[in-house]
Amino acid sequence: MTREGPEAASEIVARIGRSLPPHARLHDLVDLLGDRAGGILLAVIAIPAIIPVPGVPLGVVFGTVLTVIACRMVRAGARPGLPRWLGQIHLKAPAIMLLSRRGPALLRPIEHRLRPRASLLLAGSIRPPLALVMALMGILIALPIPFGNTLPGFAVILMGLGLALGDGLAVLGALILAALATGVSVALGWAAVAGVAQLLA
C-alpha cells in the first residue's frame, strides 16, 4: 500500500492514547496530526462519528471540528487548524481510548484497498469543492439526527484517505456516499420532526 508520510492513518490513531498529554484539548489532537496530509486529519477526526460513546456528545464536537477544518481547507494551501475557542475544548478520556483502540481496526481495511489512481479526480482545482462536501458532512454529523452520523462519517473517512493516498476512485466513491448520506439524513430528520409533531398534536 502506498502511504502519505511515514505512518499510515491507522498507525497514527493507534498511538493517540500514548501521544496526547493528560487532560488533552482538541488543539492537542490537531497538533499531533497537523503535519500529516489534511485528508488524514479529517479521516481521523471523523472516526468518533462512527464509534459512539454513551453519554459523550462526540458527534456534536467532532462534527463541528470537521466543519471548521474543512472550511479552512477550501482556501488553497491553507493549513488545517482550529480557532482558539474551539481548540480549548477538553477531550474526554473515554473518547481518546476508544479512538486509539477501535479506530485502527476501522481504518486498516480501507487503507489496504487504496492505491494511487484516477489522478484527474484529485486536481488542485477540485480540492475546494471536495472540502465543501466534507464541511457538509461535518454539519450532518453535528446535527442531532437519530442514526445520522454513520454514513457522513464513512464518507469523510473514505474521502480523507483517498485524498491522502492519491486514490481518485475512493474520492469518487466518497462523493456518492456523501450524496446518499445527505438523502438519508434529510429523510431521518424529516421523520423525527414528523414524529415529534404527531406526539404534540
Regions found by a protein language model. Give the residues of each.
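Cytosolic-side membrane-entry/anchor segment at the start of a transmembrane helix
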Residues: 1-51, 175-179, 184, 191
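Hydrophobic alpha-helical membrane-embedded segments
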Residues: 53-90
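Alpha-helical transmembrane segments of helical membrane proteins, especially in multi-pass transport
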Residues: 101-152
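Juxtamembrane boundary at the C-terminal end of a transmembrane helix
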Residues: 185-201
